[in-house]
């Protein structure tokens, strides 16, 4: 009887161990900077640089001065509060007219949009913005304003976004 009870107990323990989950629980650690970065990006969405002429990376002085008076302090503040491992990305855009890549004597939307981003990057640098925490890129016509005609002039713009390095 004792032997049968002992066998039953050993069998139950073995069964319990075998049925137990061997998967380790993974903890989902959220990025502690996610809320700050999201708030910064929402603020930056309000300040696109617009007004570029077709195939041009030159910003009309009047439009730039008006934009810079309002937006430069915001950009400076955001850069000063960037968490470690993040940069402010300056992104140039183009409308969907013309080729994306260089073709013949056409520079292509990628180059034009990158030149626009560089123009704004350099202008912010001249205004005293710390460019050590900034980067720039051109995306051509691949990111039109949602709901807009991709060929519309308002897609010729420069936007800002806080991104991981």
What spans do the regions from the language model cover?
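Envelope-exposed proteins and targeting segments
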Residues: 46-50, 55, 84-86, 132, ...
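Periplasmic peptidoglycan-binding/anchoring modules of Gram-negative envelope and division proteins
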Residues: 57-94, 98, 121, 125, ...
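Second-shell loop/turn segments in exported
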Residues: 52-65, 105-110
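Periplasmic OmpA-like peptidoglycan-binding domain that tethers envelope proteins to the cell wall
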Residues: 93-165
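N-terminal targeting leaders that direct proteins to extracytoplasmic destinations
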Residues: 1-48, 57-58, 64-73
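Short secondary-structure boundary/capping segments
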Residues: 41-42, 80, 126, 150
């Amino acid at each position: 009887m004792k032997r049968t009870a002992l066998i039953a107990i050993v069998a139950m323990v073995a069964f319990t161990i075998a049925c137990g989950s061997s998967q380790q629980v993974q903890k989902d650690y959220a990025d502690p900077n996610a809320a700050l970065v999201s708030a910064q990006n929402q603020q930056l969405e309000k300040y696109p640089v617009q007004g570029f002429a077709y195939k041009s990376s030159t910003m009309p002085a009047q439009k730039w001065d008006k934009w810079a008076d309002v937006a430069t302090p915001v950009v400076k503040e955001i850069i000063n509060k960037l968490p470690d491992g993040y940069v402010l990305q300056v992104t140039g855009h183009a409308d969907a007219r013309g080729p994306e890549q260089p073709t013949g004597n056409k520079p292509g939307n990628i180059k034009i949009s990158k030149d626009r981003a560089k123009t704004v990057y350099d202008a912010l640098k001249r205004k005293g913005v710390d460019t050590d925490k900034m980067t720039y890129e051109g995306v051509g016509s691949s990111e039109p304003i949602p709901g807009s005609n991709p060929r519309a002039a308002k897609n010729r713009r420069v936007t800002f976004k806080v991104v991981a390095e």
